Each structure stands twice: as C-alpha cells, then as structure tokens.
Swiss-Prot record:
Described purpose of this protein according to its UniProt entry: Part of the phosphoribosylformylglycinamidine synthase complex involved in the purines biosynthetic pathway. Catalyzes the ATP-dependent conversion of formylglycinamide ribonucleotide (FGAR) and glutamine to yield formylglycinamidine ribonucleotide (FGAM) and glutamate. The FGAM synthase complex is composed of three subunits. PurQ produces an ammonia molecule by converting glutamine to glutamate. PurL transfers the ammonia molecule to FGAR to form FGAM in an ATP-dependent manner.
Reactions the enzyme catalyzes: N(2)-formyl-N(1)-(5-phospho-beta-D-ribosyl)glycinamide + L-glutamine + ATP + H2O = 2-formamido-N(1)-(5-O-phospho-beta-D-ribosyl)acetamidine + L-glutamate + ADP + phosphate + H(+)
Residue sites binding ATP per the record: Y56, K95, D501, G538
Residues annotated to bind substrate: S98, H99, N100, H101, R120, Q244, E318, S319, Q320, S541
Quaternary organization: Monomer. Part of the FGAM synthase complex composed of 1 PurL, 1 PurQ and 2 PurS subunits.
Name of the gene this protein is made from: purL
The protein's name: Phosphoribosylformylglycinamidine synthase subunit PurL
Active site: H53, H99
Organism in which the protein naturally occurs: Listeria innocua serovar 6a (strain ATCC BAA-680 / CLIP 11262)
Keywords, in A-Z order: ATP-binding, Cytoplasm, Ligase, Magnesium, Metal-binding, Nucleotide-binding, Purine biosynthesis
EC number annotated for this UniProt entry: 6.3.5.3
Length: 739
C-alpha cells in the first residue's frame, strides 16, 4: 500500500497540525526542538503527547497547589496510581479516572473501557484490585436520551466490573440539567499491595528489551486523548472511532499474569505501565523519560489485528487491555513462558537506548526520531488568564433563599423522590458488589468497606462532590467535597488517609472557567491540609462543554480510610428501638445550592453553605474516637436534603421509627448546613458519649422507636410521617423515572 500521509511541507502550509490539535505556536516550538519540520508521524506524536489529557498543560500550575506528602504516603502523583501505608507492610493503591467524552458518544463501551483503564492503572503498580467505585453525573431523567445514557453507562460499568470479578462497592450519582449533553463518568479503583512489590513505570538499563503484552492493536481510539481535550459539538457524536472497545476476560488474564510477574519475577522486571490515553506512544515515552533513557521501537513487531496499519496508527491507537514491560536482558523467554500460560502473547518490540531519543522504525526505515523528554516532559505549560465570573458577586450579594414550607411532610416526600437523593438500589443492584467475598459494608451506607484478608483491618472508601456548591462558590465547594468524603469515612469507622481527585471542568480557555479550576483547587488544598488527606493521584478532564454550555465545576473526591479494627465498622441505619439519637453540629438556615432550592425555584443561586474546617476536623475526630471506643450504634453524615433526609434514611433499613425534638425550626429540617452528623447510641453508652462530647454543639434529640413512625417536634409544632410511606417513595423514584 502506498503511503498517503501528507508531506512535511503540506503539514506546514495546509496547517494540518491544527486538525491534530497543535496550535501555531506549538508547531513552531516542535520545529525549533527538532531543528526541522516534523513529518506526519512525529506531528501526531507531539499532538497527542502535548494534549491536555496527556500533558496537563493547562492544569499543571493549578495541580502544583495540592499537598501531596504525608507520613502515610508511599507513592504520590506521577505513577499509575497513588499508594498509602496501612501498616503491616501493606499499602492501598487507588486512583480515579474519567471517561466522560467517550461515554456520551458510546455510553456502554465508554463506561466499560473507563473501568478497564483504571483497573490497569492500579495493577500496573503491583496492587491487586479489590474494589471499584464510580461517580456519575447525568441530566434530568425527563427525556428518552437521558434514560438511555443512564441505563447504558450503568450496564457498561456492570458488564466490565462483574466480568473481571472486581466488586463495585460504592459511588454517587447526581442529576442536573448542565450534564444533559456532558455526562460525567468517573471510575475509581482501589487495590491492595505489599509495600515491597511497588512497581515503577520506567524503562532503564541500556539494551534491556521492551515487551508488549496483551491484546492486539487495532484502529480503535486513535486520538482519544485529543478528542478528550476539545469541546463537544453535535458533530462530536460522529467520532465513534475515537471510542475504544473493551474485553474484560482478556483483562482478567492480563491482570493475573502481570501480578504473577511482579510477585515471582520481580528480579527481572525493570518497569511496567498500562497503555492508556495515547496508547503506545504515551506509555513508552513516559517510561523512558522517567528513567532518563531513550527507546528504539520496531513497529513491524507490534501485534496488529488490522491490515496495513501505519506507525502513526499503531502508536496512537487506544486499543484496550495492553501493557508495556521493560525486562532485564536475557530473560525474555522466561516472561514469554509465563504469559503463554495465560494464553497471552508477550512480544519484544524494542529496546532501551542511552541517547534519550525516541526512535521509531518501520519496514527498516526511521519514521520518527525525536527527543523523548520533548514528548513526555517538555509540553508547553500555559498560565491561562483567570477572571471571576459575574455570577459570583451576584450570588454573594443576593438575599438568601428562604423556603416556604406549608406542608412539611409533603416537602419531605418530594425531596425523597428527587433522583439525586432517592435510593440508588436500582442502579447498584446491577453491580456484583459481593464478588471476592470481602465486602463488609455494601452500597447504600455512607462509605463502602472492604476487609483486608489475614488482618483485623478494613478499608473504607467513598466518592463525593456536590457540584452545586462549587457553582455558587468553587473554593468553599471544593473544601466541602473533601470534608464530606472524610465525613463519610469517619461515619463508617475509618480514619481518612488520602484522596484522589477527578477534576471535571468546562473549557479552560474561558477565563471564568479557569478561575473555577483555580478556586476549587484552593478549597480542596485547604481541606486536605486541615484533614491530613494528601492528594496522591488524580485525573483532569477539561472541555466538558457542548455547544458552548459547560458543566458545573465537578472535582470528584475519591477518598480512602483505614478501619483499624473490624469491630469499628459502623453504618448509617438505626439498630434498635430505645437507642438515643444525637445530632452533632449546628443547623442554620442554609438553603443556597440545596436540593430544596432546586425543587422550589428550579435553579440554584446565593452563597454556598459555610464550612469551618477547624470545627469539621474537631467533630470528625470526636466522632471517630467515640466509634473506636464502642459508644456508637449508627452514624450518618448530613448531606443533600439535610436533617430530614438523613433521619428518614436512618430508619429505612430496619423499619424503625424515631421520636425527636429538634433545636431548630421545622423548615430548617432540609437546610444543608455543613459539619453535621446524626448518631445513635445505646442507652448504656449515653453517659460516656455525652461526656466525650460535653463541650461541643451536640444535641440529644430523642430515641429510636419500634413503630414505623417518625415524629419531629420543635416547641409546639409536631410533624408525623410514616417510615414505610417515606421509604416506598425513596425506593420507587428512580425505577419509576427510568421507565
């Protein structure tokens, strides 16, 4: 087949590089680095490696703000996943990854391959994946297309996770109009590792072979990384070839084989990395660059499943289920024999060199030869202009929204029927959350908990972000996202350790959006410092806009905590009638950005709820101490829908009721003030609990009752609701909306 690729002259004169994603100034920079004009393959390499998705060129200045260190950190940002220490020589590896753009175009495969990619990131570190979580955003469930997206995304996550045998144990889903054409699909994987097995993605040692393992390379997903770095338009729907197709059974074999190599052949393994965004070029150039080495790759040896593939296509393909290994010279057969046992091919496709060049050979000719650091490290970094949006000042100055509630129980029922609040059982029942049999707390409580085999420990995990608060005030909202994640971990009996962040924003070239990114990072950083949860991994997804309409700022916080003893595991539901109910924290009239404001006004506006990080930290530490001392029967964080929703949720599982008198007016039942916890305590532990909390704003409200009735009293006012009525509304809402 004759080569139909454009010449260097055509690339320059017709500005073909622009179609590939390079700006004029970036193209000039490539020319000056090379001392010549790049050919088509080289232009492709730079365009994809310098995309935002691979280089973080627009977000690097912001990412530098994050605290990334702590005594618990074994591996910070920069590798496939971050790792924290949980004692006993064990670590937990975790990371969140977005697959937003592909999931709009091809929701089943987009979501499935998002799951596959994040699993590879975790096992490339040497960790065995033990759990998956996800954080999803969709538009309102009032159109057939919205329902289709939800059904297909959930089916894709379930199809991949269930097949590979990793439990999907938790997550969150929110519905807002801004996500109608920009759904967000963020997947998080958590793995367990012996600290001695931690791997690096590096290719070093002159002459050491580089091996390609796993599925063959096809034309799927070419320019997936560039596709994720531009705004959507209606034509974007046509870009299906940029969406990859996944095979979870192949991935299961790959996972076991790679962990085998790491466990039993670590002496001959130099480095290992997943082929993710930007495929082979990204994994290979990063591995060489990190080691200060060069690489020579022979494209003829890359396993191909389609005919006449060009070097450009092979290097940029994002075919799934592929890994790159660097091994010591003389041990290729040993590695090949191991992979053969799993029915996988392991092929030498190149070697490490000492000239720091990235050299690509095809049919005996050099088709690309560029400095490896130029690809992997030297992408230009942009300090984008930042400008406060007009809405921010308007929200700050606006009179606070005060709801009019004539019928408290009626509003209560309406809130429980909102899809963001309603039970997600219909969704998570499609996931296998018990496979591997270590899931101690299943979906539906504040955090998921997975036991650590052979110890008395467990790992608590959650994903959180209320993007409405970030729309009102990205700095406060960013801090609240971290605080809420930590609250969920603490309520479950865990000590928060670290976070991974999935930063989903609109187009960074708009100064108002870049301002959102900066402010959100400031808020996240402040909360991480106060709560001692460094950022150890993450992902940035920008350009979440379609036809000029962007999403709310949505930095998803994935957090992991350590439950030091299985006896500390705590869930949100009341356990026994007669238990005493307490509220930790103060309730104010804070409705801006709340589920109630959205319900009554059809929009959100005003000042975000206040967050005092010192108070947050103090309450979290007190509650965790109370749980560890065995004083707490149940605990639940107050989030969307405030006290009213939390109280109802606590009664549902066991079919109990509650008889409480609250220290605030009844229309504040649905206020979303921060730093609050609903706790129940056995009568015999009441005195000890009260003593521990005695100097704080902690209120004894009443007791859990055996009848299925919730009674809430304030002064002379009393409202009464049936637990079973509320529960049937809460459980029935999403199945009904998805019909």
């Amino acid at each position: 087949m004759p080569n139909m690729e454009p010449t260097t002259k055509e690339i320059k004169e017709q500005k073909i590089y622009q179609e590939m994603g390079l700006t004029d100034s970036e193209y000039e920079l490539v020319c000056s680095i090379l001392g010549r004009e790049p050919n088509y393959t080289e232009t492709g390499l730079f365009s994809v490696m310098w995309s935002e998705h691979c280089s973080y060129k627009n977000s690097k200045p912001v990412l530098r703000k994050f605290p990334t260190e702590g005594k618990q950190v074994l591996q910070g940002p920069g590798e496939g996943a971050g790792i924290v220490d949980i004692g006993d020589g064990l670590g937990v590896a975790f990371k969140v990854e977005s697959h937003n753009h592909p999931s709009y175009v091809e929701p089943y495969q987009g979501a499935a391959t998002g799951v596959g990619g994040i699993i590879r990131d975790v096992f490339s570190m040497g960790a065995r994946p033990i759990a998956m979580l996800n954080s999803l955003r969709f538009g309102e469930l009032d159109t057939p297309h919205a329902k289709y997206l939800v059904s297909e995304v959930v089916a894709g996550i379930a199809g991949y996770g269930n097949s590979i045998g990793i439990p999907t144990v938790g997550g969150e889903i929110q519905f807002d109009p801004c996500y109608t054409k920009n759904p967000l699909v963020n997947a998080m994987c958590v793995g367990l590792i012996e600290a001695k097995d931690i791997q690096k993605g590096q290719a070093k040692g002159i002459g050491n072979p580089v091996m390609y393992v796993g599925a063959k390379t096809g034309r799927d997903g070419i320019h997936g990384a560039t596709f994720a770095s531009v705004e959507f338009s209606e034509e974007g729907e046509q870009q299906r070839s940029a969406v990859q197709v996944g095979d979870p059974f192949m991935e299961k074999l790959l996972l076991e084989a790679c962990l085998d190599v790491i466990r039993d052949h670590s002496d001959i393994l130099v480095g290992i990395q997943d082929m993710g965004a930007a495929g082979l070029v990204s994994s290979s150039s990063e591995m060489a660059s990190k080691a200060g080495a060069g690489l020579e790759l022979i494209m003829d040896d890359v396993p191909q499943r389609e005919l006449h593939m060009t070097p450009y296509e092979m290097l940029l393909s994002e075919s799934q289920e592929r890994m790159l290994l660097c091994v010591k010279k003389g041990h290729v057969e040993e590695i090949q024999a191991l992979f053969e046992r799993y029915g996988l091919e392991a092929v030498v496709i190149g070697k490490v060199t000492d000239d720091k060049m990235y050299k690509i050979i095809h049919h005996g000719e050099v088709v690309a030869n560029v400095p490896v650091d130029a690809l992997a490290e030297d992408a230009p970094v942009y300090h984008k202009p930042s400008k406060e949006p007009a809405r921010y000042q308007a929200f700050q100055e606006e009179d606070a929204f005060v709801p009019v509630i004539d019928d408290v129980v009626g509003v209560w029922k309406e809130l429980l029927a909102q899809p963001t609040i309603a039970s997600k059982r219909h969704i998570y029942e499609q996931y296998d959350y018990q496979v591997r049999t270590d899931t101690a707390v299943v979906p539906g409580s504040d955090a998921a908990i997975v036991r650590v085999r052979g110890t008395e420990k467990a790992i608590a995990m959650t994903t959180d972000c209320n993007s409405r608060y970030l729309y009102l005030d990205p700095e406060v909202g960013g801090a609240i996202a971290v605080a809420e994640a930590a609250r969920n971990i603490v309520c479950s009996g865990g000590k928060p350790l670290a976070i991974t962040d999935g930063l989903n924003f609109g187009n960074p070239e708009k100064p108002e959006i870049f301002w959102e990114i900066e402010k959100a990072a400031d808020g996240i950083s402040a909360a991480c410092l106060e709560l001692d949860t460094p950022v150890i991994s993450g992902n940035v997804s920008l350009y979440n806009e379609t036809d000029g309409t962007g999403i709310y700022p949505t930095p998803v916080i994935g957090m992991v905590g350590l439950v030091e003893d299985l006896a500390h595991i705590t869930t949100q539901d009341f356990k026994n009638s007669g238990d005493v109910i307490f509220l930790i924290g103060e309730t104010k009239a804070e409705y801006s950005g709340s589920e109630l404001q959205k319900l009554q006004q059809g929009k959100i506006s005003g000042r975000a709820p206040e967050l005092d990080l010192a108070t947050e930290k103090k309450y979290q530490q007190l509650l965790l101490t109370a749980i560890q001392e065995g004083l707490v029967a149940s605990s639940h964080d107050l989030a969307e829908g405030g006290f009213g929703v939390a109280l109802a949720e606590a009664t549902f599982k066991a079919g109990l009721g509650a008889d409480v008198e609250v220290p605030f007016e009844l229309n504040q039942l649905f206020s979303e003030s921060q730093s609050r916890f609903l706790v129940s305590v056995k009568p015999e532990n009441e005195a000890a609990f009260a003593k521990l909390m005695e100097l704080e704003k902690v209120y004894r409200l009443g007791v859990v009752t055996a009848d299925e009735t919730i009674r809430v009293k304030h002064k002379e006012e009393l409202v009464t609701a049936s637990t079973s009525d509320l529960r049937s509304i809460w459980e029935g809402a999403i199945p009904c909306l998805l019909k």
